[in-house]
Amino acid sequence: MTMRTCAVAGMFYPRDPSHLEQLLEKFFSVSPGAANSVGIVSPHAGYIYSGEVAARAFSTISPDFSGTFVVIGPSHRGYINCVSKVPWETPLGVVDNDTAFVESLDIETDEFSHRDEHSLEVQMPFIKYRFPRAQIAPIMMGQQDYPSAIRLAEKIGAAIQQTHRDVRIVASSDFSHYVPEDTAKSNDLYAIEPLKTLNIPEFYRRIAERGVSACGYGPIAAMVTVCGHLGAKKAQLIRYATSGDVTGDRHEVVGYAAISVI
């Protein structure tokens, strides 16, 4: 495979470049303020539901950034941790892969497993639109337990030291799935609270305590851990929303959060 082609264009986001660009321009028209994040949490649902929240997360990174985005997404099919070493197609153009950084991660390459996974792909148009010179290091995370998150964080940290890359880290995750909105909001905000002090063990404890069905809690944990090693001191919840804000159905929603680590 010489390029990872779009798998969910026309489903999760527009395939037409003009339509997609107009949509992203609308999403990025609302600025949250300072653009100084080391890492972010960004959702990966269809843009109609979570695109505005994702843009709020990416808006906390300066548009002048031209380094490497380490994008960590959960596998929705149970694959093991693996990386992709090829460029990624978007309707707005190709996002280049930082192959030297990816190789330094010492994680198995598996382009087949990346082929249909949407959790990483949904982030790419945001990167291409706002950071046209940036490269990517895509990581799919299969095992999301605490030790696995710490091991992945250590590999990312070692790769940063080895390559001296300027990086920003994106954890791709939605939060509660298919529960009443009051339940989603209560559980999600409860789980997010310890992230504000970069307290990953407490984050895991609260996820388990409430049974929060956040699909990318492992990527979140790995991202926050790396950011802490890079000097980050805290995280901020920039925006929280649910699918009910779009559909009007408050009985069964999915939660979305934009989180900035600084």
Regions found by a protein language model. Give the residues of each.
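Active-site histidine-anchored catalytic micro-motif
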Residues: T2-K234, I238-R250
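Terminal, contiguous helix-loop blocks that mediate binding/assembly
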Residues: V246-R250, Y256-I262
